[in-house]
């Protein structure tokens, strides 16, 4: 049926051969995020999937990125979305990821092996996907200026758009429901999650169609609204309809996100609180180096050593600390005591300057899963900072850099890590830094090993009544801090520049990394043990209540008060929230009872500083104005009196007293 191309037809897009059945979709839209203890910079294997109307995956793309930072262009073919779709597409029996059906079409007439002439025009037939000729005509239809396609959102649309229908009408029951597509009126929306358009021009798709391939690729791009949504793991769905004469054919498709950990940790065996509790291994005798070379052509396969026990790991930390200290300061290791601190914090960080490496793809060490966030409670020095560093931590920054735009991975140099507000990590994602208020400082990790002189240790064993002063404990971070990066430039000429290549320093770094991994495992084991213990206790409680059911339960039989298990983590969290609420209420009550003059000082901190600054000069000026005239008058009167006295003295000096004349009788 002919129609004008200058206006949209006001037609009902519901299938006239079947009534519109109301469909109520109950969807649980949860926010899918990583585990609460994971770092936001952790890299996952992310897969974006495009599904057909039966929720089958027909196209997918994968990559290694942090969650909610990778928004690629999705390029499925239009005919891929029609697999197991309505019969007029011709692919109702076609399985996903199968080859395009039908023989190719030929130019200049039919020939053996060809279905029909590619140049044969499309008459009254609806574009289909079952042959190369049909796919070519479908491409021509979607690229025409007066035809094309439009897309309508599914259940995630606003409530006022409920009249747009369900999957039976491809969510496009009436005009105005479309939010994107390729049509002459250019449908658009400010709230929908995606935009859809053709990925190839018509000229490019012609040859692809003639070669009997999928030749109607789409390009689906995420909008700003879609990038803010974190419920992609449950999937979102749309309907697509062709804008042609008569009834517009259509289909439904969806987009969902799947992610998995690149390095899952699967526990095998028992679940002790402290993992790998093994006795201390006996020291092996030192072997002299052999000059015998292995035969050429036979590579030596490295043997994987079993994981070290707790005692071995602690001893390796002290041994590595001694080797590093002996290499840099041999005079301090002539006679000394190195003590490993048994209480937290077990590690301290030293901020350093260094040159990190920039990667466009996630390196292997960025994909290591971390079930818990490890934080540093003590960081000293000044080093390299990245991100929006708050004023409370700017003292740790010698140089502050802003994160570059784009998706990059900043890997810390060897022997260092990034201490971020979200925890320790070997590499950081610039996308996460740009999306959040996270900041990171480049630090060296040093175990809490204290250095004591022999006099201090001997004094502990001496029985003396004298009270000695508290000794100053030097930690390994104070003695060797900044040696990985900053100490290299400072150690030129002293031999410390070669420390990075020595086996001693590598031994210390390896011991630190092993111990950090075991600390994380211990935290996980403690968490699992507490959960298991609570389950056992609650199960035993239920069993005892059933046994003493006739007596009224366990508490009635024991004649004691009933005790219940409480998750103190949640209680503490709720208590802190209530405490903050009460403090806010008291603060508001206190402010409401204050006068305007008192409140002026509280609301304007700068006003208090201004008053305290100018109050002194103002008081002095006021005193001068009040008592200045009186003091000035007194001073003038005093000067006048002194001048009068001086004038009198001058006048008296010009005259002398005459002697009296005596007359003789």
UniProtKB/Swiss-Prot annotation:
Location of region: Disordered: 268-309
Coiled-coil spans in chain: 500-537
Lipid positions (S-palmitoyl cysteine): 630
Binding site for Zn(2+): 117
GO (cellular component) term, any one: membrane
GO MF terms, alphabetically ordered: identical protein binding; metal ion binding
Keywords: Cleavage on pair of basic residues, Coiled coil, Disulfide bond, Fusion of virus membrane with host cell membrane, Fusion of virus membrane with host membrane, Glycoprotein, Host cell membrane, Host membrane, Host-virus interaction, Lipoprotein, Membrane, Metal-binding, Palmitate, Signal, Transmembrane, Transmembrane helix, Viral attachment to host cell, Viral envelope protein, Viral penetration into host cytoplasm, Virion, Virus entry into host cell, Zinc
Biased composition (Low complexity): 281-299
One GO biological process term: symbiont entry into host cell
Region entry Receptor-binding domain (RBD), spans: 34-267
Annotated Pfam families: TLV_coat
Motif (CXXC): 336-339
Sugar-bearing residue positions: 45, 199, 326, 358, 365, 398, 434
The record's account of how the chain is modified after translation: Specific enzymatic cleavages in vivo yield mature proteins. Envelope glycoproteins are synthesized as an inactive precursor that is N-glycosylated and processed likely by host cell furin or by a furin-like protease in the Golgi to yield the mature SU and TM proteins. The cleavage site between SU and TM requires the minimal sequence [KR]-X-[KR]-R. The R-peptide is released from the C-terminus of the cytoplasmic tail of the TM protein upon particle formation as a result of proteolytic cleavage by the viral protease. Cleavage of this peptide is required for TM to become fusogenic. The CXXC motif is highly conserved across a broad range of retroviral envelope proteins. It is thought to participate in the formation of a labile disulfide bond possibly with the CX6CC motif present in the transmembrane protein. Isomerization of the intersubunit disulfide bond to an SU intrachain disulfide bond is thought to occur upon receptor recognition in order to allow membrane fusion.
Signal peptide: 1-33
Site (Cleavage): 469-470, 649-650
Motif CX6CC location, chain numbering: 555-563
Residue interval(s) of motif YXXL motif: 655-658
Transmembrane segments: 611-631
Highest taxon, organism lineage: Viruses
Region (Immunosuppression): 538-554
Region (Fusion peptide): 472-492
Its job: The surface protein (SU) attaches the virus to the host cell by binding to its receptor. Interaction with HECT ubiquitin ligases activates a thiol in a CXXC motif of the C-terminal domain, where the other Cys residue participates in the formation of the intersubunit disulfide. The activated thiol will attack the disulfide and cause its isomerization into a disulfide isomer within the motif. This leads to SU displacement and TM refolding, and is thought to activate its fusogenic potential by unmasking its fusion peptide. Fusion occurs at the host cell plasma membrane.
Free-text comment on this protein's domains from its UniProt entry: The 17 amino acids long immunosuppressive region is present in many retroviral envelope proteins. Synthetic peptides derived from this relatively conserved sequence inhibit immune function in vitro and in vivo. The YXXL motif is involved in determining the exact site of viral release at the surface of infected mononuclear cells and promotes endocytosis.
Quaternary state and interactors: The mature envelope protein (Env) consists of a trimer of SU-TM heterodimers attached by a labile interchain disulfide bond. The activated Env consists of SU monomers and TM trimers.
Name recorded for this polypeptide: Envelope glycoprotein
Originating organism: Moloney murine leukemia virus (isolate Shinnick) (MoMLV)
Organism lineage string: Viruses, Riboviria, Pararnavirae, Artverviricota, Revtraviricetes
Gene: env
């Amino acid at each position: 049926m002919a129609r004008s191309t200058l206006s949209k037809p006001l037609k009902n897009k519901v299938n006239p051969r079947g009534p519109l059945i109301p469909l109520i979709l109950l969807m649980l839209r949860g926010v899918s995020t990583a585990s609460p203890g994971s770092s936001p910079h952790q890299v996952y294997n992310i897969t974006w999937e495009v599904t057909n109307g039966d929720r089958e995956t027909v196209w997918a793309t994968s990559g290694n990125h942090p969650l909610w930072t990778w928004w690629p262009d999705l390029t499925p073919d239009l005919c891929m979305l029609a697999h197991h779709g309505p019969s007029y597409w011709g692919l109702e029996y076609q399985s996903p990821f199968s080859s395009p059906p039908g023989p190719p079409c030929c130019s200049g007439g039919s020939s053996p092996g060809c279905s029909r002439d590619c140049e044969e025009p499309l008459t009254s037939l609806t574009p289909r996907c079952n042959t190369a000729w049909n796919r070519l005509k479908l491409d021509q239809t979607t690229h025409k200026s007066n035809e094309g396609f439009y897309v309508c959102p599914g259940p995630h649309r606003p409530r006022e758009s409920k009249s747009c229908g369900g999957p039976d009408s491809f969510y496009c029951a009436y005009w105005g429901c479309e939010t994107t597509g390729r049509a002459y009126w250019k449908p658009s929306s400010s709230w929908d999650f995606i935009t859809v358009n053709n990925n190839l021009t018509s000229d490019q798709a012609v040859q692809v169609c003639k070669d009997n391939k999928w030749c109607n690729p789409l390009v689906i791009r995420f909008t700003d609204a879609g990038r803010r949504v974190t419920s992609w793991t449950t999937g979102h769905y749309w309907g697509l309809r062709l804008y042609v004469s008569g009834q517009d054919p259509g289909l439904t498709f969806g987009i969902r996100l799947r992610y998995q950990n690149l390095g899952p940790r699967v526990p095998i065996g028992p679940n002790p609180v402290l993992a790998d509790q093994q006795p201390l291994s006996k020291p092996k005798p030192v072997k002299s180096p052999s000059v015998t070379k292995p035969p050429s052509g036979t590579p030596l396969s490295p043997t994987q050593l079993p994981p070290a026990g707790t005692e071995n790991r602690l001893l390796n930390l002290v041994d590595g600390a001694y080797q590093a200290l002996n290499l840099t300061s041999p005079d301090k290791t002539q006679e000394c005591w190195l003590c490993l601190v048994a209480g937290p914090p077990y590690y301290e960080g030293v901020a350093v300057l260094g040159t990190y490496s920039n990667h466009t793809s996630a390196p292997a060490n960025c994909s290591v899963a971390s079930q818990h966030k490890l934080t540093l409670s003590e960081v000293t020095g000044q080093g390299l900072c990245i991100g929006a560093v708050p004023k409370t931590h700017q003292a740790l920054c010698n140089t502050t850099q802003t994160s570059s735009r784009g998706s990059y991975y900043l890997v810390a140099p060897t022997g260092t890590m990034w201490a971020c507000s979200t925890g320790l990590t070997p590499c950081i994602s610039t996308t996460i830094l740009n999306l959040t208020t996270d900041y990171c400082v480049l630090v060296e990790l040093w175990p809490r090993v204290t250095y004591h002189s022999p006099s201090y240790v001997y004094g502990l064993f001496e029985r003396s009544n004298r009270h000695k002063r508290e000794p100053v404990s030097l930690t390994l971070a104070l003695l060797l801090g900044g040696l990985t990066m900053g100490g290299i430039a400072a150690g030129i000429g002293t031999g410390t520049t070669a420390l990075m290549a020595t086996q001693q320093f590598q031994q210390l770094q390896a011991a630190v990394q092993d111990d950090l991994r075991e600390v994380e495992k211990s935290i996980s084991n403690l968490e699992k043990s507490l959960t298991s213990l609570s389950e056992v206790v609650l199960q035993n409680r239920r069993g005892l209540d059933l046994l003493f059911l006739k007596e009224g339960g366990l508490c009635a039989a024991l004649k004691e008060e009933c005790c219940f298990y409480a998750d103190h983590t949640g209680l503490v969290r709720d208590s802190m929230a209530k405490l903050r609420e009460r403090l806010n209420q008291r603060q508001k009550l206190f402010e409401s009872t204050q006068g305007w003059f008192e409140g002026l000082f509280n609301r304007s901190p700068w006003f208090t500083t201004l008053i305290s600054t100018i109050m002194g000069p103002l008081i002095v000026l006021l005193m001068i104005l009040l008592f200045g005239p009186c003091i000035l008058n007194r001073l003038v009167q005093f000067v006048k009196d002194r001048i009068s006295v001086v004038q009198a003295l001058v006048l008296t000096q010009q005259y002398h007293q005459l002697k009296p004349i005596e007359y003789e009788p």
